Amino acid sequence: MTTHTEPRDTSAVGKTKHPRNFIGTAMRVLTTVTGSEFAEKYQIREPINRIAYQATKTGFQTLGAANRAFKAAQGGSGKAKRLTSTPKDYFNLTPDDEQQMIAETVREFATEILRPAAYDADAAATAPEEILKRSAELGITMINVPEELEGAATERGVVTNALVAEAMAYGDMGLAIPLLAPSGVATTLTNFGSDDQQRTYLPDFAGENVPQSAVVIAEPKPLFDAFNLSTKATRVPSGYRLNGVKSFVPAAGSSELFIVGAQLEGKPALFIVESDSKGLIVEADPGMGVRAAGMGRLLLQDVAVPTSALIGEGESSAAAYRDVVRLSRLGWSALAAGTAKAVLDYVIPYVNEREAF
């Protein structure tokens, strides 16, 4: 199947013409981010400048590195880096000035880059590779990685991440899903990963070539229960063996890393699985309405992972799984809200301006 490198002249919503070409728009968005207080606060101006320079040379070609060799960074303290939340005296979900700026920047990116590409991406049932790499340039993944691991995060940003998801889905949910999936992996490793797991994987999520990845929970069965998984993990002398089928995996064919949910001794747990693991098979499984996400299934047939692949241990493993499920539900809700807002903004002027006869 051929994937168009240039989006069509019409968008998937309203069939409106492109305001700009892809490279020009992307460069303008990067320039906006580079000059913002957001870039200054999170110290991402320099890496974004490097990306912008590279973009002018390559025309935003993909610099992917499939199945890269993940290696632990040196100098670990043995203690994992954790982000904390700033306590507030009252419950208030109103975005502050910084969150508002981030949301507006992402929404502009989504409207001017994602939406024009959505029609072709949906037809091809895959997201264009050049678009899959753009989230790194906005710092979306970087703000979920602690500063000590080359990221930009100083505290947990649940509300900020929800605003980003809502703004991204305003452009197109199908493309937003694979773009945001690596942030879910980075957040999981930051919140629950061990020191060794964090040093092995998180630095890549703060770099210029973020690995495509996903947290994989869903399974292809009716009345799916996230806390009663059919995928099983069995202890073996060398670690664990995973068997089962996972579904609804975004950008499954191009992902380099998965965090897989599996039942371990009666309780759900999370395991880190690299894409080149023996026994791991990826099948295409397009999802209606989100075909652009490149959804697929993971077939795990005696996939061997080391002891260090388990996220958490004992009760902390189960607690990590519960929190990841809660956060994923919040993320899906934010995506739905962004999509609904886009529909509303299209329908209102259409109803007011249409001529029935």
Describe each region flagged by the PLM.
Residues 2-90, 94, 98, 102-104:
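Extended, charge-enriched "interface" segments that sit outside catalytic cores
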Residues 75-79, 107, 137-209, 251-257:
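Internal helix-loop-helix
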Residues 127-128:
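His/Cys-centered metal/cofactor-coordination and adjacent catalytic loops
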Residues 208-218:
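A short, Trp-centered hydrophobic/proline-enriched beta-strand micro-motif
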